């Protein structure tokens, strides 16, 4: 009793009795098949694991838009001393999404986002989803060769970036560079009418790769 609480001893004894009963009733059972968990505990485990629920088939863009409609003036994004309300975020994303559609971005097209940590990163991700595309975030501190590999292997033709990073993007061939600091937010702020399906691609991330070569998934 100095080592264990009374409840612990009672539980151990209950398990021991249950195991002995199981052995007596199943004399040919293998050790690995002997159960020490009581029926009462099994029911408790089943209750804990009862996590079945309805699957929400709404897209990410739709769920954010729903939040915009319900709480337009609530703060959606904070980065350092800058903030965007849900309405401001939606307006900027709509404008950028309409611009992307205008220049040719279609469903499942990969759009690379190479930005410093900023509000524009979130706006760009949201806008790409609204346009029906899939985003690929690339750290601007990566070496040019690595960035080039990501963009080429993902077959991305568009790069959303910022003024201070434009020179890095220019080193990558066959890419349409879009400056987020430009006046692209002056486009139509209406929500794009794009038929986005649940099975459409949403984003790509690159793993380190078991062979040492990053893989996009």
Task: Label the predicted regions.
Residues 1-33, 51-217:
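Carrier-protein-dependent adenylate-forming modules in NRPS/ANL systems
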């Amino acid at each position: 009793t100095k080592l264990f609480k009374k409840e612990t001893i009672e539980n151990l004894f209950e398990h021991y009795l249950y195991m002995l009963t199981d052995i007596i009733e199943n004399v040919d059972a293998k050790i690995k098949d002997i159960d020490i968990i009581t029926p009462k505990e099994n029911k408790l485990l089943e209750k804990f694991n009862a996590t079945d629920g309805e699957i929400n088939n709404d897209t990410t863009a739709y769920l954010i838009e729903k939040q915009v409609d319900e709480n337009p003036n609530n703060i959606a994004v904070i980065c350092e001393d800058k903030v965007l309300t849900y309405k401001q975020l939606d307006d900027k994303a709509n404008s950028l999404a309409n611009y992307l559609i205008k220049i040719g971005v279609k469903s499942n097209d990969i759009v690379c986002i190479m930005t410093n940590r900023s509000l524009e990163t979130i706006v760009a991700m949201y806008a790409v989803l609204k346009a029906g595309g899939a985003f690929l975030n690339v750290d601007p501190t990566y070496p040019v060769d690595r960035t080039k590999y990501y963009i080429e292997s993902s077959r991305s033709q568009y790069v959303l970036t910022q003024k201070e990073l434009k020179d890095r993007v220019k080193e990558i061939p066959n890419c349409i560079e879009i400056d987020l600091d430009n006046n692209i937010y002056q486009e139509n702020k209406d929500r794009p009418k794009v038929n986005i399906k649940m099975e459409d691609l949403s984003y790509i991330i690159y793993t380190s790769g078991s062979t040492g070569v990053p893989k996009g998934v």
